[in-house]
Regions:
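Coupling and communication elements adjacent to P-loop NTPase active sites across diverse families
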Residues: 2-13, 92-142, 225-347, 359
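ABC ATPase nucleotide-binding domain signature region
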Residues: 31-32, 44-104, 363-372, 376-429, ...
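ABC-family P-loop ATPase nucleotide-binding domains
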Residues: 75-141, 403-472, 478-481
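Hydrophobic anchor residue at the start of the ABC signature
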Residues: 149, 461, 491
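Catalytic Walker B motif of ABC-type/P-loop ATPase nucleotide-binding domains
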Residues: 160-164, 169, 401, 472-478
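Flexible loop/N-cap segments at domain edges
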Residues: 303-406, 423-424, 428
Length: 524
């Protein structure tokens, strides 16, 4: 199988933390999945492949052009056309259309007359119904994601490095994404927790203990192989424990038998001649030396078995160690937490007035396609945007978690952000809470921009839910994005235990059902 890209003995260290150690890999033609728990280095590996992260050892060799699509949205000061092509060409086409084009303008677009139709087709396929000069900040998170992906798929011969590409996409957007990936001739490496998307890959690469392991087949085949590996690992641990106990029993028995023979021999030697006693003493010395060597060998075997058992135990404990997250208790005695009446949104395709009453303990889903106004509605409720008209009343305190964690300073560390937002808590308290979310060691001290999307989300969840003020209403804008399956279950459990009201935007039906959504507002 021809390799598109080769990694040779790649090593990477952040501070004192090793991320990869002498990793080698060949990326084949076609679609490959990349999986790992949050914070294991998926985004970092994509940056290494793209040449944006400097390695401490080894080299990366490409045989094809490649393009990276990051999790982060495009710059908000750009227009749609700037994300699809050189904005200068768009300005030239405008002057041509208006009859103001110069001779230099006509020369500059001589080979690009097809571009305006291409841009329009890309927007139509991605279901982005907006003019080319629309500012990016006016688009929803899903529309921004599709815009970045649409440009990537236009590079038909490039190998694509896609970082959580299904994040923020509605169901039709996810179907569009799957079709585009399957039909992309250049191939792709897809880092994702989206099981449905990973069922379309030819093989899966797993980041495992600072290295990489490759599994043939799609996600379901990968899970079967992982389960077999886990069963074999546990069986090996059990076999090692049995062998350890047997070796230890033999060692103890040998020591006991030798001590018994020594006591019996001492009684006999008291009645024997000196020459005979010397001869027996010599034989006993040789026997003792032989026994010592035998016991030393047994001791080495015991230590080896103990080390193997310890390694397996550590691996298993890391896999099974539960994360902990609890939301602050609802303090309000009022039944109604939110009341909307004839609310008119400032942005989004939903142009009808919205009326809604949310009571304590209710779980509401805000449904609708990308661009319908779901995030806009949450921002209006949170007081970050002003409605065109209508009534928006909240009672008690609310927490709002937006898609981009905009309230966090990405240049500051997790601890610095938490101290700034909640100065009343001690460092030891934040350390304990971060550790319970598997953010340990130097990780809480690194700038947030160096953490994975899932790790940043955990910090954001702590920031909005673990302050000293109780929360009555929580607004969550696609919180299941970025999270691995284990962390997603953690969030489900926390929401289920919360006694206040929840307004949720999500496109993941399994997540929606898991948290017990009992009501829905549809903006389509």
């Amino acid at each position: 199988m021809t390799a598109i890209c080769t990694l040779e003995n790649i090593s990477l260290i952040f501070g004192d933390t090793p991320i990869f150690h002498k990793v080698s890999l060949e990326l084949p033609i076609g679609i490959t999945g990349l999986v790992a728990p949050n914070g294991s280095g998926k985004s970092t590996l994509l940056s290494v492949l793209h040449g944006q992260a400097s390695v401490t050892g080894g080299k990366v060799s490409w045989r094809r052009r490649h393009h990276l699509v990051k999790q982060l949205n495009p710059r908000l000061d750009l227009r749609i056309v700037d994300c699809l092509a050189d904005g200068h060409l768009y300005e030239v086409f405008l002057r041509v259309e208006q009859g103001h084009a110069s001779e230099d303008d006509l020369i500059s677009v001589a080979d690009y007359w097809h571009l305006p139709l291409t841009w329009q087709r890309q927007l139509e396929e991605a279901k982005i119904n907006a003019p080319l000069d629309t500012p990016i900040e006016r688009l929803s998170g899903g529309q921004r994601a599709k815009l970045s992906l649409a440009y990537a798929f236009s590079l038909s011969s490039d190998y694509l490095l896609l970082d959580e590409p299904s994040n923020h996409l509605d169901q039709s957007g996810r179907e569009w994404l799957q079709e585009k990936i399957l039909n992309h001739a250049g191939g792709a490496l897809v880092a994702s927790h989206d099981v449905e998307l990973l069922e379309n890959v030819r093989q899966i690469i797993e980041i495992y203990q600072r290295g990489l392991k490759t599994y043939g087949g799609a996600y379901s085949a990968y899970m079967q192989q992982k389960e077999s590996e886990q069963a074999a690992l546990l069986q090996r641990a059990e076999d090692n424990r049995k062998e350890f106990n047997q070796l230890n029993n033999v060692r103890q028995k040998s020591l006991h038998n030798f001590a018994t023979r020594q006591r019996q021999g001492k009684g006999k030697r008291n009645s024997q001649s000196k020459s005979l006693m010397d001869s027996q003493k010599d034989r006993a010395g040789k026997g003792l030396g032989k026994l010592k060597r035998k016991l030393e060998q047994r001791q080495l075997q015991l230590e080896k078995k103990r080390e193997e058992i310890s390694k397996i135990t550590v691996i298993e404990s890391q896999r099974l160690r539960p994360q902990k997250l609890s939301l602050t208790k609802c303090d309000s005695r009022k039944s109604i937490q939110l009341h909307l009446e004839n609310l008119q949104l400032p942005y989004g395709s939903h142009d009808k007035p919205i009326s809604l009453t949310v009571r304590k303990g209710e779980r509401w889903r805000i449904a609708g396609g990308n661009g319908s106004g779901k995030s806009t509605l949450l921002k209006v409720i949170a007081g970050q945007l002003k409605a065109l008209s209508g009534v928006c009343q909240t009672r008690g305190s609310l927490c709002y978690l937006d898609q981009g964690f905009s309230f966090l300073n990405k240049e500051l560390s997790a601890l610095e952000n938490l101290f700034y937002l909640h100065p009343g808590r001690k460092e030891s308290e934040w350390r304990t809470m971060l550790g319970s979310l598997r953010l340990r060691g130097d990780t809480p001290l690194l700038p947030l921009r160096l953490l994975s999307g899932g790790e940043q989300l955990k910090v954001a969840l702590l920031a909005v839910t673990r302050g000293t003020i109780a929360t009555d209403l929580i607004l969550l804008d696609e919180p299941d994005n970025h999270l691995d399956l284990d962390s997603r279950q953690l969030l489900v459990n926390a929401i289920m235990d919360f006694s206040g009201a929840v307004l949720l935007v999500s496109h993941d039906l399994s997540f929606i059902n898991a948290i017990g959504v009992d009501s829905q507002l549809n903006l389509d």
